[in-house]
């Protein structure tokens, strides 16, 4: 056993490589052992340090891989499971346990998070050389019982299936202990680099090999001052010094100091000594000069994006200044990898800097995982429509074109069907020939055939199920689709997809191993496959060696690269405080460690935090050979953050904090990094002028479009793809002639008028271009309204010999049997329930009709308007016709006055502000149309709400009071002629604000005609502004702004071109109500008509 240590500015790898070469010269086979996170880089570093640049006698590897290079004899043939296979084994065993048998974990026994934690605990106990029976020492009885039961069942299952338990290292330990290694130990040597602690398992291997006479060399970084100090607690080198002291004591071997004498103390050595002195409470006088501050820079940036841009610009500048440099000379360290991952790709692609982030990617969000998840959902939830749509949207199932998938989705949404039997029926329903049923049925068979075959599978052996799954993948064209999708991708992306497919196949292989010979149902198989894929990870290797390597800062080793940029070093990220998220608490770990024998040790993360983090900081400060940049943003993940206390210490020693900002106000040579970055800087430069004009924080793309749009305008050019603000063009004369020929009548409906005043462009989309809403066969608000209308129409048309209740029930029965409504409301149990609710509404609304002796109904569903009678005449002599349908016309028995009724599914009232602004013209239009048809005597126009009144019992003292309050809401709401109001009963809400004199009535009709005239003139002129109305002057209601994706109108940017509703100009600021409010609006109407 040979122990070495060196100062942190001397390469430990160089020293240990020389030791390895000497051992090779003596005829030894050397295993150069590095930690898992550093083995790839360490191999390259060792090769660079070798005098011959290569050696067949030195193998750079990890502890876990050593067994591959040793000859193991007479070991039983067992299949080894990785984490995926182990996860499947846990899933299988937990599925077989009754939830009642598990007191703590019963309710979540198949939760992926629990399975992941059980796998981690399984590995931890293996590494710590602890038996599962040691869990008997847990004090929590319920947890102890559960964990013992789970691990006993899993262990028994693994033994029964001849599946290897434990790690590769535990198998090597077992082989050495049982003398099953035929390799000559005298010819083997271990050189161990980069460790500051061994796991119990790793220490056991070292101990066994040392006992077999294997020569072992272990090196670590430590200062002589720290190693020889009698007190190491809190020291920067505490982790490595305690590690060396433990080994020196155990093997009775003093550690040798291999530190080199440096001609001059560099900036990083100076920083290290100052930090060490600060933590061991010794005094040290060192001056930090300008050169040191240049070599070790501390940046303070505003945002993470700015940090990355500054790093990219710095790398580009250094490459430009020094042609000998390449990307591999740079290293980027991240305080939090997840927070920087997306921005990193965006900005480094923009600056054309190749990089490699050595991080495994989870398969959980890959389309292949979503594909399996969708099939599982189809099976588990009995073929829901949404699950089938999700399956098709993965673009992996069947080779259908996107247009075919869209057509199929649109049709099944129209049908609203769920369940396999419904999909198996031939598609026959269409909407006025809109759907190509022949093509849709071909698509239906193509989509269903592979799924039907797969879902017909019963519980069977795993091998047979895998064969059926393989057939399904071929018939469903999944492999073909994956292949086609990857052919169009770049080489790097193709490699990623290849790794994903390998991971997918590996999950299937592990399933075959774990469930060999077992009976498995299809649903269990899909659930296991999805669970395995959710746990799976994949990674790619860099396409070229010359890339900027990016990694988490806590994985860094000293003297890694010439230039190192460490970003995101906020208080939350540096130091990283390891949290215990396992199934065992720190207290339980401590108790288990005390109860078990020596050499058996579970890691307690909280006890390692301090020494680990200080050693990490030391490695970070010494990670660069030439220049180090440490940066912290003021805003991290959109919240305020402070820089790390370690950075503040460096500033205290004399290093300077530099406020770094991206300066877009001027362009300099630093912007000449690459074509894309220069373009970005130019846009940002021009953006400054735009920002000072608008003072709005806009995104890059929007600013770019506005800048380019402005430049094109100055040169008299136009690019319709990038408008500076949403605008529409006036329709051409020939287009208008085709749409509205002079000899053809021009019709405008009351709903069209309302749409026009909501947003002129919405009228253009719906009534000119004919944009339609997605069709639905299932009952909706429209079909509900038609159903209720038909019931009342029929009830009021039946002879009066029978009572109203009998007529209503007869109308309900006859209407329910109509083919149209029978098809809709017998479709499903949900539709039947909806029908029962609607019938209750009909019976409740009938209460008003039953007890209203003052009126009689003379017409139902009465049409008005047509070619015979023009509604208004335009200034150019052209007539505008209005046609529509009135739900009901009533007549007062007393004097024959006419009233108009419109049924509504919710409470609707006539509002003067909305009427004045063109948003409530329905009732005045009905009255005007009937007047033009010869009617002169009116008592009003009103809405009748068809709904069951809801009354809070808390607001009334008795049930009788609730009935009274409910009946108050069941009234006709609308406009009534003052002279006829005395004839109207209690069912009419005839307060003063709703009553009109003859002069007000005529004024109402005149202003309504004026609204139609203004709208018709604009429509016939082909002018449709993008001007959704705003009621409060701050936002646009969602039902007004339904076509945002088409118009591009955004309220927070384009509110200036919205239509602000006209309001009363109240000089004294008083709020008017009732009749005074009505009079104020009529005064405003008079002013508008007199202009």
UniProtKB/Swiss-Prot annotation:
Q: Which family does it belong to?
A: Belongs to the helicase family. AddB/RexB type 2 subfamily.
| Record text on subunit structure and interactions | Heterodimer of AddA and RexB.
What organism is this sequence from? Streptococcus pneumoniae serotype 19F (strain G54)
The EC code for this enzyme is 3.1.-.-
- What HAMAP family does UniProt report for this protein, alphabetically? AddB_type2
Give the GO terms filed under biological process for this record: double-strand break repair via homologous recombination
Q: What is this protein called?
A: ATP-dependent helicase/deoxyribonuclease subunit B
What cofactor does this one take?
Mg(2+)
Query: Which class of enzymes does this protein belong to?
Result: hydrolase
Q: Which UniProt keywords apply?
A: ATP-binding, DNA damage, DNA repair, DNA-binding, Exonuclease, Helicase, Hydrolase, Nuclease, Nucleotide-binding
Q: Which InterPro entries match?
A: ADDB_N (IPR049035), DNA_helicase_suRexB (IPR014141), P-loop_NTPase (IPR027417), PDDEXK_AddAB-type (IPR038726), Restrct_endonuc-II-like (IPR011335)
Pfam families, A to Z: ADDB_N (PF21445), PDDEXK_1 (PF12705)
Coiled coil location: none
Record's keyword annotation contains rRNA processing: no
What molecular function does GO assign, one term?
Answer: double-stranded DNA binding
Function noted in UniProt: The heterodimer acts as both an ATP-dependent DNA helicase and an ATP-dependent, dual-direction single-stranded exonuclease. Recognizes the chi site generating a DNA molecule suitable for the initiation of homologous recombination. This subunit has 5' -> 3' nuclease activity but not helicase activity.
| Further information | Despite having helicase-like domains, this subunit does not have helicase activity.
């Amino acid at each position: 056993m040979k122990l070495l240590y060196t100062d942190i500015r001397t390469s430990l790898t160089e020293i240990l490589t020389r030791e390895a070469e000497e051992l090779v010269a003596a005829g030894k086979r050397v295993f150069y052992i590095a930690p898992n996170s550093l083995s790839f880089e360490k191999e390259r570093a060792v090769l660079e340090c070798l005098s011959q640049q290569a050696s067949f006698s030195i193998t750079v590897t990890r502890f876990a891989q050593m067994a591959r290079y040793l000859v193991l004899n007479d070991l039983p043939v067992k299949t080894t499971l990785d984490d995926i296979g182990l996860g499947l084994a846990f899933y299988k065993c937990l599925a077989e346990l009754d939830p009642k048998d598990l007191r703590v974990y019963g309710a979540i026994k198949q939760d992926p998070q629990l399975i992941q934690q059980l796998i981690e605990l399984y590995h931890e106990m293996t590494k710590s050389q602890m038996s599962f029976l040691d869990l008997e020492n847990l004090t929590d009885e319920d947890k102890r019982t559960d964990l013992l039961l789970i691990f006993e069942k899993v262990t028994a299952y693994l033994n029964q299936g001849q599946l290897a338990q434990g790690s590769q290292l535990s198998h090597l330990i077992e082989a050495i202990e049982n003398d099953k290694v035929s390799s000559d130990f005298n010819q083997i040597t271990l050189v161990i680099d980069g460790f500051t602690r061994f796991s119990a398992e790793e220490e056991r291997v070292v101990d066994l090999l040392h006992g077999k006479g294997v020569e072992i060399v272990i090196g670590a970084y430590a200062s002589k001052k720290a190693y020889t100090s009698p007190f190491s607690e809190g020291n920067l080198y505490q982790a490595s010094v305690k590690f060396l002291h433990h080994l020196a004591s155990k093997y009775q071997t003093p550690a040798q100091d291999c530190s080199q004498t440096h001609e001059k103390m560099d900036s990083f050595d100076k920083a290290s000594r100052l930090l060490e002195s600060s933590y061991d409470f010794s005094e040290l006088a060192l001056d930090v000069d300008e050169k040191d501050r240049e070599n070790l820079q501390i940046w303070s940036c505003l945002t993470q994006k700015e940090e990355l841009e500054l790093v990219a610009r710095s790398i580009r500048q250094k490459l430009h200044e020094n042609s000998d440099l390449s990307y591999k000379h740079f290293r980027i360290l991240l305080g939090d990898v997840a927070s920087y991952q997306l921005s990193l790709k965006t900005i480094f692609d923009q600056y054309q800097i190749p990089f490699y982030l050595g991080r495994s990617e989870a398969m959980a969000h890959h389309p292949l995982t979503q594909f399996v998840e969708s099939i599982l959902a189809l099976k588990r939830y009995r073929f829901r429509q949404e699950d089938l749509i999700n399956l098709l949207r993965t673009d992996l199932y069947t080779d259908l074109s996107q247009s075919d998938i869209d057509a199929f989705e649109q049709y099944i949404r129209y049908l609203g069907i769920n369940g396999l039997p419904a999909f198996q029926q031939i598609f026959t329903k269409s909407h006025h020939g809109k759907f190509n049923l022949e093509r849709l049925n071909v698509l239906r068979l193509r989509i269903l055939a592979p799924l039907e075959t797969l879902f017909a599978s019963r519980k069977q052996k795993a091998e047979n199920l895998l064969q059926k799954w393989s057939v399904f993948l071929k018939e469903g064209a999944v492999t073909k689709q994956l292949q086609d999708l990857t052919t169009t991708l770049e080489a790097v992306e193709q490699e990623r997809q290849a790794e994903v497919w390998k991971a997918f196949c590996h999950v299937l292989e592990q399933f075959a191993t774990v469930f060999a010979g077992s009976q498995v149902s299809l649903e269990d198989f899909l659930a296991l496959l999805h669970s395995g894929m959710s746990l799976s990870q994949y990674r790619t290797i860099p396409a070229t060696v010359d890339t900027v390597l990016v990694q988490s800062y806590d994985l860094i080793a000293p003297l890694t690269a010439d230039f190192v940029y460490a970003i995101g070093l906020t208080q939350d990220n540096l130091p990283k405080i390891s949290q215990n998220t396992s199934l065992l608490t720190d207290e339980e770990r401590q108790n288990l460690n005390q109860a078990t024998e020596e050499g058996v040790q579970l890691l307690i993360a909280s006890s390692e935090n301090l020494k680990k983090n200080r050693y990490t900081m030391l490695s970070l400060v010494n990670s660069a050979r030439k220049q180090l940049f440490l940066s912290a943003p003021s805003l991290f993940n959109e919240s305020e953050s402070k820089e790390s206390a370690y950075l503040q210490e460096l500033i205290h020693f004399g290093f300077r904090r530099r406020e770094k900002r991206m300066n877009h106000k001027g362009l300099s040579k630093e912007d000449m990094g690459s074509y894309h970055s220069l373009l970005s800087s130019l846009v940002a430069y021009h953006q400054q002028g735009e920002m000072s004009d608008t003072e709005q924080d806009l995104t890059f793309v929007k600013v770019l479009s506005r800048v380019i749009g402005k430049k094109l305008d100055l040169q008299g050019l136009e690019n319709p793809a990038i408008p500076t603000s949403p605008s529409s063009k006036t329709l051409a004369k020939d287009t208008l002639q085709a749409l509205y020929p002079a000899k053809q009548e021009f019709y405008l409906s009351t709903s069209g008028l309302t749409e026009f005043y909501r947003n002129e462009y919405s009228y253009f989309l719906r009534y000119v271009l004919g944009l339609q809403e997605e069709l639905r066969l299932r009952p909706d608000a429209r079909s509900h309204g038609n159903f209720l209308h038909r019931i009342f129409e029929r009830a009021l048309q039946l002879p009066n010999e029978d009572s109203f209740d009998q007529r209503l029930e007869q109308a309900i029965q006859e209407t329910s049997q109509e083919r149209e409504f029978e098809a809709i409301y017998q479709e499903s149990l949900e539709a039947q329930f909806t029908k029962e609710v609607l019938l209750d509404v009909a019976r409740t609304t009938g209460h008003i009709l039953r007890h209203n002796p003052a009126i009689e109904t003379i017409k139902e569903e009465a049409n008005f308007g047509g070619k015979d009678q023009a509604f208004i005449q335009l200034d150019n002599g052209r007539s505008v016709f209005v046609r529509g349908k009135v739900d009901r016309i009533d007549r007062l028995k007393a004097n024959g006055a006419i009233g108009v009724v419109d049924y509504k599914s919710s409470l609707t009232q006539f509002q003067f502000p909305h009427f004045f602004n063109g948003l409530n013209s329905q009732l005045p239009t009905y009255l005007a149309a009937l007047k033009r048809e010869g009617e002169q005597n009116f008592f009003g126009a009103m809405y009748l709400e068809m709904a069951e009144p809801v009354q809070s019992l808390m607001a009334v003292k008795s049930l009788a009071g609730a009935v009274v309050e409910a009946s108050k809401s069941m009234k006709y709401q609308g406009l009534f002629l003052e002279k006829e109001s005395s004839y109207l009963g209690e069912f009419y809400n005839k307060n003063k604000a709703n009553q009109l004199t003859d002069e007000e009535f005529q004024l109402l009709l005149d202003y309504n005609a004026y609204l139609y005239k203004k709208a018709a003139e604009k429509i016939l002129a082909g002018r449709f502004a993008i001007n959704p109305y705003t009621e409060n002057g701050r936002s646009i209601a969602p039902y007004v702004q339904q076509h945002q994706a088409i118009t591009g109108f955004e309220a927070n940017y384009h509110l200036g071109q919205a239509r602000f509703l006209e309001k009363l100009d109240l000089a004294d600021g008083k709020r008017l109500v009732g009749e005074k409010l009505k009079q104020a609006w009529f005064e405003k109407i008079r002013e508008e008509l007199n202009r």
